[in-house]
């Protein structure tokens, strides 16, 4: 836990810097001394041996430094990115991200964590995202709102990186209010967030239909076309509604542009404008400069939680392009979609389903058939694998370690939230995809080529399953032995602490190992 609090201004950091500096200086001095005493006739072997010895000495010094700053040199070196207020209080922005292809269970962890946070934020995507939260047997479905809205003491921020379809957003608020949740005065929208219009959604559907069997598999929520308008610099932002004449002029121009670009597209401009004029006051009452607000909340020492949407493998840059979303659901979106600096980030929590699922098209190396009586059917049926947004049946497969390592490399996860472990109950065996092979050779990195990724072989490790119900387990040691072995093996393969373990669908069905659980304490009760 000391590492999480480790500050650049601390004595340990200064001492550590001196230790590293001394080790490097010693290495340089020794190298110079050995060089000056050698001759052209000296063989290379003694020189190589001396370099090895020097490197070993440097390694020992670095290990000593690790012990100094971390307390336990055998523990997993968690990142220390928390900031310190003038009063000495440590704080930072924590992030929950999807580590696979989405639908990992991010919303549940956000709901669990958000009870202790002051601000919950969304930073990317739009109503194509979907989170389902179960509280006291009651289901709440979120698409644009952060799941943290269920915490009555938290304010919710929709950042500038999100694209917002106002009708869907207002319907979501009305549905929430009808469920007895009071959101008034707690939901803020960035004035810089771009708008999704109905014609964006129609264009989205047309583009998918035009692609035929090569379709991307989008949700047809207009996300891609809205981001296209943003990049083309002709889009409208939420803040534009604060100046009606400006909004009306720009909206008419955008409609004309789309009607000229898409044959047969007809937009009822006057009807659309009438709707936005009706809701403008309501939207404007929630519209603020969220960049200024969020940073001021940070400086005031407020705890901030970012809820990621979609997932890394759907990232426009890092995902299985072109079968991706149109935004960056990886860690970079927190900076660009909320307007905060990197030094303000603290915990980066990767949410990983115990098996893989995917909605839509694209490569899926560990995919299983969903035929009756197969492991794939078990995962699909027991896991209720149907999209929150689309209702489509999700594709299912075994956990994919190469994909997970790639995701961890990009995001720098400090802890893992392993969800839906309970779905494995009743399976005689479970598998973990350990490595990719292509043309008989192991791949050392995630291939960018879809042709390669679609044709990789997967090397699996088979572990025994379990039959016991784990939904009532509250501690790690209460889990069946085979379940524990599975979790520990995944942790070992990833090299990242698994802090949270999902054992059921309800809000409380989570084992939290606590912040101090690292690789050195695996298998012990914290």
UniProtKB/Swiss-Prot annotation:
Cofactor(s) needed: Mg(2+)
Binding locations of Mg(2+): 103, 130
One of the GO BP terms on file: IMP metabolic process
Cross-referenced CDD domains: AdSS (cd03108)
Domain of life according to the entry: Eukaryota
Keywords, ordered alphabetically: Cytoplasm, GTP-binding, Ligase, Magnesium, Metal-binding, Nucleotide-binding, Purine biosynthesis
Pathway involvement of the protein, from the record: Purine metabolism; AMP biosynthesis via de novo pathway; AMP from IMP: step 1/2
Binding-site residues for GTP, renumbered to this chain: 102-108, 130-132, 394, 420-422, 502-504
PROSITE patterns xrefs: ADENYLOSUCCIN_SYN_1, ADENYLOSUCCIN_SYN_2
Cofactor note: Binds 1 Mg(2+) ion per subunit.
Active site: 103, 131
Broad EC category: ligase
GO molecular function term, any single one: magnesium ion binding
Known catalytic reactions: IMP + L-aspartate + GTP = N(6)-(1,2-dicarboxyethyl)-AMP + GDP + phosphate + 2 H(+)
Alphabetized InterPro entries for the sequence: Adenylosuccin_syn_GTP-bd (IPR018220), Adenylosuccin_syn_Lys_AS (IPR033128), Adenylosuccinate_synth_dom1 (IPR042109), Adenylosuccinate_synth_dom2 (IPR042110), Adenylosuccinate_synth_dom3 (IPR042111), Adenylosuccinate_synthetase (IPR001114), P-loop_NTPase (IPR027417)
Annotated residues for binding of IMP: 103-106, 128-131, 219, 233, 310, 325, 392
A GO-annotated cellular component: cytoplasm
Its biological purpose: Plays an important role in the de novo pathway and in the salvage pathway of purine nucleotide biosynthesis. Catalyzes the first committed step in the biosynthesis of AMP from IMP.
Family named by the database record: Belongs to the adenylosuccinate synthetase family.
Entry protein name: Adenylosuccinate synthetase
Organism of this sequence: Phaeodactylum tricornutum (strain CCAP 1055/1)
Classification of source organism: Eukaryota, Sar, Stramenopiles, Ochrophyta, Bacillariophyta
